[in-house]
Amino acid sequence: FVHEHLESFIEAEIHEDAVSFIDLINVVKNDANIQQAWQNKSRDDLYNASKSWYQAINKNHRITHFYFHHLDKTNFLRVHNPQRFGDDIGRHTLRQAAQTQQTSFGVELGTFGYLVLRIVSPWFIDGQLVGYIELGEETEHILEKSSATLETNIVTLINKDKLNKNEWLLRTAEPDQDYLWNALPNHVLVDSERIKSSISNQHGRFELIKKGLNPQLKGELSKDQNDYFFTGNFPIVDVAGTTAGAYVFFSNISAEIKHNQQ
């Protein structure tokens, strides 16, 4: 049951990362310079006080998103993108943190189709709730680790109805981006590096993915030219309980097949 092993492995890795990021947020909350800049409502000072934090946690912990939010859930500062601020944040993790006054975490879909593990924590200074701090990491490295540990390959497919096509096309400079959007009827492939290393022909890759997307199957044997693959899928369910897409896995089992045929 490859899908069950993959699913439980990914969930465990996500939880492990989330726990470590909660510790990071707690350290940031208590930084005196960050607290002072927030209380002064100085965006420039807050950026200057927190950018070294971002550089360190980006390098050491793969954090790609770092936010400070107002109590009304509007964004005050994106440390990773300081030119953009002032927008309403409607994500489930922030709403949940605001409702419960507890740290919230889970995987959510980003604007450009990337899955992001987000951790949002209420921020208290001298016992008073002043805002929310959010950290996020794109989850691609977890799939890399899953593939290596369980000796299979896994790719991420996102439902097209969860994406804005024009925004998605802006995310990549690849010349065949229109082909990539249209290659599958209901999904787009987020990352293809692993499958590229296994199947060099682009048409063959998508044919294998289509077989792996068969909703009736937990896994099946597929043939691509002279290679045999075991393929299957399981749904990507975000923290709000919405199905955002599917993970498709494939294992090249040609050696085993040929050995058994001898």
Predicted segment positions?
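Extracytoplasmic/periplasmic ligand-binding sensor regions of membrane-associated signaling proteins
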Residues: 55-136, 144-146, 213-226
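Intrinsic low-complexity, intrinsically disordered coil/linker regions enriched in small/polar
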Residues: 141-226
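Soluble periplasmic/extracytoplasmic beta-strand elements of cell-envelope proteins
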Residues: 67, 153-155, 248
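Conserved beta-strands of PAS-like sensory domains
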Residues: 114-148, 230-259
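Juxtamembrane extracytoplasmic/periplasmic/luminal helical "stalk" adjacent to the first N-terminal
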Residues: 1-44, 48, 52-64, 103, ...
